[in-house]
Amino acid sequence: MDIKAKIEKLLAKTIENGCTVEEAASAAKMVQRLIGKYHIELAEVGNETETADGEVLDAKSVRKWEIRLISTIARNMRCEAIVSHRYTAGNINRKSFVYIVGMDADRKAVILLYEKLRKICKVGMRKEQNYHKSMYGNAKGIADSYGFGFTMAIKEEMTKQAKALVLVKPKEVDDKVQELFPNVKTRRVNVSCNAHAYDSGMSDGHSAMSVSAIE
């Protein structure tokens, strides 16, 4: 079974068919470990022949918290996520594209894991929105606040394990980024958050990543 098939099998259980949020989210660490083991085995037999490349994340629109989530996952799994903006209709309408740059197996793992964690985050997000609607009559800004909190928790947990597994981004990935996006710049995303929603998202993210129910 190839690495992509193993990851797909690992992430096959979904919330919709009976897997809990916590069980599904704990797969993130398992995917990281699988990627780490995969590259160690290739190195041991001298067969690490993959080359870095980029592919577009299939998404109609991307919110700021989703950009941070995909960037977090990519950087902790030997890849980079680049956001590119294109204007249409006389430079009036802007569409954002997210490119994942990395080795083939790593890219596939990043995209699969992002799609899984994004779904999980949205489940908690809806609960938080419903809470604020019932308590305060509206949920303005709650979704993004929860999303940023959730993403921060994922970042802390995945960064910790990436260091333990020595998941180092190959130089070829940085070279490919420069080839594809020679004018790329790093920009800081500043947002104002609802403290309760942010803390709820962060708590749920940490709880999900620490559960070993499907290990």
Language-model segments: residues:
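Long alpha-helical, hydrophobic tracts
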Residues: 1-52
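Extended, helix-rich structural scaffolds rather than catalytic motifs
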Residues: 47-215
